[in-house]
Amino acid sequence: MNLVLSVVFYVCLSFQYYLLGNECLDLFGYNKNTRTILISGFLSTFFLTFIIGFVCQVLHLSWTLYFILQSILFVVVDGYLLFKNRKNIFCRHEIKLQRILKNNWVLILFAGVFISFSIANQLPYYDLNYDDVYYIGKVVNHVGTPHLMNEDYFNGSLVHINGLDLIRVINTYELSYSYFGTLFHIYLPYFCRVTMSLHNYVLFGIVYKQLASLFVKEKYSQYAIVPFFYFLIPAGFLQTGIYECIRVYSYDLWQFQTAAFYGGSIVRMMAVPILIIYSLPLVEKMEFKKIIYIVLMSISMISFSTIYVQVVVLFFIAAITIKCVYCFVEAFKAKETKWMIVSILGILVIVGFLLATRYLNINTEEFVYNVTRYHGFQQEWYDHDSLLKYGFVVFALIFVLSKNSQSRSIVGMVLVLYVLVWKEIFTVLLTITSFNYFFVTMRTVSSIQYLILFFLGICALRIYESIFKKMYFIPNLAAVGLVMLVCVFFRHNVNEM
């Protein structure tokens, strides 16, 4: 029954995402396709849950009152959307299932295989997946509580809060899960571990396919996520038992495989590519309404995890840098000396700011502790990680293979992010923006590792495009590659045992 109700939930949520996402993109002046509409709908829906959830958690209102207020907001918003689109909703639209399957079979396979491995994995049941006790406990215990945020969700004991625990109050996604699970009568642990995990895997595929479409032809874009099947390997949970040269040292990688429903997983898996997708138009032309949309989108993202704060700060630095570079190139082409000078000054200011952070003298015990802990992981993990060690090679290759300024701007943004986390050059900046939590920085590094892995897929596709003008071979190559990948690593792990 949980499976059937989950299907009903997906159908209703798809309509919600499409109608709301379409309205938001029209309102803020974005070009749109089905993928950007769904992504925008996801962000907008959880922005609506943040509005009510944040207020109710701050005021410690009851679950019943929260549920009523949240339902009223959705009824009003959805009622408006249905009324506005009433003519289109009842029109007959031809759905070509065969074309959908052909253009998205890799995404479907990705979501299906990862959710199957996640469900089959026994670690969540034996070890409670490290953080499930807190997050699933919070989702379950929200329901029916007389006062939100009134208990310790690790053990269920009542707490007396003096002041405001801003970090926990901002995170409203657990409350959203409680609301949707209760609304659709889905068993809440199942809703978290299965329903929302599958939702997030599908959304991950949609986000990266949209990003890939900015580099390669539409018909090739789904194949860009093939490298992420690498995370399926049996040894991947702890990244042990495989050759060091192909090992990915990625912090909290187990969450990608077994806890995709975590708010931190959503930020780590999708925040940077989503920021790129909706910030890219601003590189060519600054528009105030698009900046407002990114602010609202950021509020939605921070409702999942406050680790997003560091992500958006570092991304802002990267985006401003690339904006200055873009302006310089355009001014150079137009031979506008004044704007060339302004652009160069902008770049120098950014570089000066970054270099100045290296000389900040912060000697608090907490700061030193987190710098030391991060340094330990740098030596043990990142100095040996192939993606980070040879990242510059990947960036050089994809920059050469990129065919327009738009795709090169994306590469430039990620390159700046890569430089910011490379070899502890800007450790002080990273520690400050992580609010002295070293693991926050490591999760940001994981986001960049995912993008480098994605770029490897793009490089392969661009090379394929240049050699073969048709896509006859690529579906077969992808299928054979996936089978070989799983077989080889299963065989290797059997030998290791």
Regions found by a protein language model. Give the residues of each.
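Signature aromatic-anchored transmembrane alpha helix within multi-pass, membrane-resident enzymes
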Residues: 340-348, 462-495
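Active-site lumenal/periplasmic loops and adjacent helix-entry segments of GT-C-fold
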Residues: 116-270, 493-497
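Membrane-interface alpha helices of multi-pass inner-membrane proteins
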Residues: 57, 291-308, 317-320, 347-351
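Membrane-interface transmembrane helices that cradle and orient dolichyl/undecaprenyl
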Residues: 267-268, 272-292
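Membrane-embedded, hydrophobic transmembrane alpha-helices
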Residues: 1-100, 360-373, 412, 420
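Membrane-interface helix-loop junctions at the exits of transmembrane helices
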Residues: 48-52, 116-124, 227-251, 351-366, ...
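Transmembrane catalytic cores of multi-pass membrane glycosyltransferases
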Residues: 1-5, 12, 127-136, 140, ...
